[in-house]
Amino acid sequence: MGKKPVVIGVAGGSGSGKTSVARAIYDHFGDRSILVLEQDFYYKDQSHLPFEERLKTNYDHPLAFDNDLLIEHIHKLLRYEPIDKPVYDYTLHTRSSDVIRVEPKDVIIVEGILVLEDERLRNLMDIKVYVDTDPDIRIIRRLIRDIKERGRTFDSVIEQYLSVVRPMHNQFVEPTKRYADVIIPEGGQNVVAIDLMVAKIRTVLEQKAVL
């Protein structure tokens, strides 16, 4: 049997701890055998739109993502072909001209708020994970991230959360929990769940003759 990578989808609300879960799994396997594809990098290119129009982008809606490109890249990685991962510029609200070269690995983690929303993506996944975290914790984490990393103001983050993030979470993100094989409360802090995930991944790798 030839080698075939394992694809793991890690979904959950903004600030739920998806990245922490992905990082915890990554740390168990190391750089040699695992890579992470962040759905945040796959927002649609909006360079054809005026900046004022880009400011209206709803980043929490399924239509904001270029899932066609993400799916194309996963298929390439499944064939052990390298990809050029896009980079998104949040200050300009469009895709950057830069790309990141990603070499194929045995484990592919696809991480993002809506990676379980698209059936085409789900069909590529061997293991589907939903990270479930209290809404109060999620908004605090989003505040810290958007102010520190994306140059946002406190008021703008709160306004966006109430008018966009929360309703989009309830409408699109939360319902994808039903597709998950594993639901992890407390995100990356849940050591027991992470250890169980790692054991499951190793089993799937062995079944696919990767290890």
From Swiss-Prot:
It comes from the Bacteria. Coiled coil: none annotated. The gene is udk. One of its GO terms (molecular function) is cytidine kinase activity. GO terms for biological process: CTP salvage; UMP salvage. It catalyses: uridine + ATP = UMP + ADP + H(+); cytidine + ATP = CMP + ADP + H(+). Its main location: cytoplasm. It comes from Geobacillus kaustophilus (strain HTA426). Its EC number is 2.7.1.48. ATP binds at residues 12-19. This is Uridine kinase. Keywords: ATP-binding, Cytoplasm, Kinase, Nucleotide-binding, Transferase. The keyword Phosphoprotein does not apply. Signal peptide: none annotated. Gene3D superfamilies: P-loop containing nucleotide triphosphate hydrolases (3.40.50.300). The lineage of its organism: Bacteria, Bacillati, Bacillota, Bacilli, Bacillales. Pathway: Pyrimidine metabolism; CTP biosynthesis via salvage pathway; CTP from cytidine: step 1/3; Pyrimidine metabolism; UMP biosynthesis via salvage pathway; UMP from uridine: step 1/1. GO terms for cellular component: cytoplasm. InterPro entries: P-loop_NTPase, PRK/URK, Uridine_kinase, Uridine_kinase-like. It is found in: Cytoplasm. The keyword ATP-binding applies. PANTHER family: URIDINE KINASE.
